[in-house]
Amino acid sequence: MFCYQCEQTAKGEGCTKIGVCGKQPEVADLQDLLLYALKGLALHAVEGAKVGVNDHETNVFTCEALFSTLTNVNFDPARFQVLIPRVVEYREKLKAKVKAAGGKVDFADPAATFTPAKTLEGLVAQGANVGLKSEPELPPDIVSLKHTLLFGLKGISAYADHANILGQHDDAVYAFIYEALAATLRKDIELGDWLKLVLKCGEMNLRTMELLDAANTGVYGHPVPTSVPLGPKQGKAILVSGHDLKDLEELLKQTEGKGINIYTHGEMLPTHGYPGLKKYAHFYGHYGTAWQNQQKEFSKFPGAILMTTNCIQKPQQAYTGNIFTTGLVGWPDVPHVTNRDFSPVIERALALPGFPETVNGKSVMVGFGRNTILGVADKVIEAVKNKNIRHFFLVAGCDGAKPGRNYYTEFVEKVPKDCVVLTLACGKFRFFDKDLGTIGGLPRLMDVGQCNDAYSAIQVAVALAKAFNCGVNDLPLSLVLSWYEQKAVAILLTLLYLGIRNIRLGPSLPAFVSGNVLDVLVKNFDIKPITTPDEDLKAILG
């Protein structure tokens, strides 16, 4: 195996024996083989588009399959053993349609005619030959951009999958995914053209996040400021982790009147702000912090646990009988719920003791999406003009286990009192429960939402720039970002596509970005690694 798609990759270079995430070598090889098969399918899809062939079922499946290879989603080799032959089935159906329409179906690349082995061992062996290091003859900078594109596609596919579940999709997004996957098979693309493809990936991710925003707000309403208790309520309990709003809604419906309280974990926290979800009286509070603390936190949770998307870690013995997966999530021997029938989860929750008493602890505020912030835009603009607000910081992104991530806690603690902190994604758990007070009736710490709500933050920035008659880069706004997995890669590419400059990125830079590619990013976008909170605040504020 060789994998370096996440921030915690071994030694900052790559995982070769086992993934730091817990991914076994055979799963890494199976994921590489799945990607290879998808590239062969993409060749046919690109040609199909030229003759009017477009199959929605294939499009949706492609995103699901790509999403399955994202960090901390699916660790179950048996699931990949099913997925890989399905790619070939979809490819052959598509091939027949393209041929019937007069399109090209003969390709020189062997990915187009790939035949999967009949056994799991055979598939693993095939995967070992088509991984990220299978093209040693290519220049390192080409490989760097090619892999950046591939990881960005994984991020897009995750958001496209969530949007499609709620009825929003755009064929242009699927067309780009195929175009980019097919491009990764080529060896004749120049460096400049790879860079264009990478930035186009950012453009298409912006469109995909727009679709997901429309899906979430269209179905559940715009988030509103909501206080979420961090202490438990006496009674039976189910904990929901991940990102999928539809899964959460179905669980809320199925548990209504059963005496079970529903708690969020990780990136599910912002869902408390959606009117269509918060209307359920038993949708109670939030438990725990970010994904990397789940083994400790889940061990103490006295109810059932449902993982809806990434991020799952190896379940500990203390809760192996209590945890369930659904959707694209998989872990060997963990019960998997299909078709959103959460009966097994509910039965387990009823059998477990639940919380013995109500604890009136802290609470946190969520629901500061674009609709909420732009609803008080006049207050914000006035506060800036009156110099009550000096600067805005978007301190956002993924959390992780590295000690260096304490930077983000310290940074927020040291932000001057005349500055506002916007946050989103699970990086917020480094400081989400801190009371930073208010400025002119506005909270100094505002939770914009999940990682995909970067779209919301972008819309706020664009609206403020318009109000001040300047560019986004001219606003008193600084982006201090943390990254971990491939959705963060896609979001970073979106920011670069938009021409956002002076982004501070940490806790370490991606292993897949070569020195020369980094130089290009620094030269064109002034992207820089984080240093210390004091140094960075001084550089930003003077």
UniProtKB/Swiss-Prot annotation:
Name the keywords, alphabetized. 4Fe-4S, Cytoplasm, Iron, Iron-sulfur, Metal-binding, Oxidoreductase
Keyword Oxidoreductase carried by entry: yes
Q: Name one GO molecular function term.
A: hydroxylamine reductase activity
Family matches, as InterPro entries: HCP/CODH, Hydroxylam_reduct, Prismane-like_a/b-sand, Prismane-like_sf, Prismane_a-bundle
Any single GO CC term annotated in Swiss-Prot or TrEMBL for this entry: cytoplasm
Q: Which residues form a coiled coil?
A: none
Cofactor binding note of this UniProt entry: Binds 1 [4Fe-4S] cluster.
The main location class comes to cytoplasm
**In the Enzyme Commission scheme, what number(s) does this protein have?**
1.7.99.1
Superkingdom in the source lineage = Bacteria
**What biological-process GO terms show up in the record?**
response to hydrogen peroxide
Query: Which residues of the sequence carry a binding annotation for hybrid [4Fe-2O-2S] cluster?
Result: 243, 267, 311, 398, 426, 451, 485, 487
Q: Which Pfam families match?
A: Prismane (PF03063)
Q: Give the location in the cell.
A: Cytoplasm
Its recorded reaction(s) are: A + NH4(+) + H2O = hydroxylamine + AH2 + H(+)
Function per UniProt: Catalyzes the reduction of hydroxylamine to form NH(3) and H(2)O.
PANTHER family referenced in this protein's UniProt entry, alphabetically: HYDROXYLAMINE REDUCTASE
Stated family: Belongs to the HCP family.
Designated name of the protein: Hydroxylamine reductase
- Originating species: Syntrophobacter fumaroxidans (strain DSM 10017 / MPOB)
